[in-house]
């Protein structure tokens, strides 16, 4: 990945609220299935904004911080996804998204961020990201003092 896109907590909440507004009316949803781990925080934000209490997870491992590797389903929510929102932070190459679509063919699959290769696999997303860009999510970063450029 040549570029980095840094996401702040404020930006993430703004994007999640925008996505939540597109998922109204809330009565159409039975619950949320968050893709662990990237979809956990966005899933919590959607659950809060939409007032949804039924939240489950599908646990899929496909990354080690910045390296993609073999896909493993560690835990899945039951059913075919009918009436459920499946949320992940990002659709990238589409590997995880294909697995989600196979497991939950009737779910409404959404992400906050979408790269071109995976974009056709989601029902909705908020932010376009170039394919060669790595996203630094706020839960992967700490707040650190940065000295002034002039060194004062």
Swiss-Prot record:
Disulfide bonds: none
A molecular-function term among this protein's GO annotations: magnesium ion binding
Enzyme Commission code: 2.4.2.-, 2.4.2.22
Gene3D superfamilies noted in UniProt: 3.40.50.2020
Positions contributing to 5-phospho-alpha-D-ribose 1-diphosphate binding: 37-38, 69, 88-96
Keyword check for Mitochondrion: no
UniProt xrefs under CDD domains: PRTases_typeI
Purpose: Purine salvage pathway enzyme that catalyzes the transfer of the ribosyl-5-phosphate group from 5-phospho-alpha-D-ribose 1-diphosphate (PRPP) to the N9 position of the 6-oxopurines guanine and xanthine to form the corresponding ribonucleotides GMP (guanosine 5'-monophosphate) and XMP (xanthosine 5'-monophosphate), with the release of PPi. To a lesser extent, also acts on hypoxanthine.
Assigned protein family: Belongs to the purine/pyrimidine phosphoribosyltransferase family. XGPT subfamily.
Protein name stated in the entry: Xanthine-guanine phosphoribosyltransferase
Organism: Klebsiella pneumoniae subsp. pneumoniae (strain ATCC 700721 / MGH 78578)
Gene designation: gpt
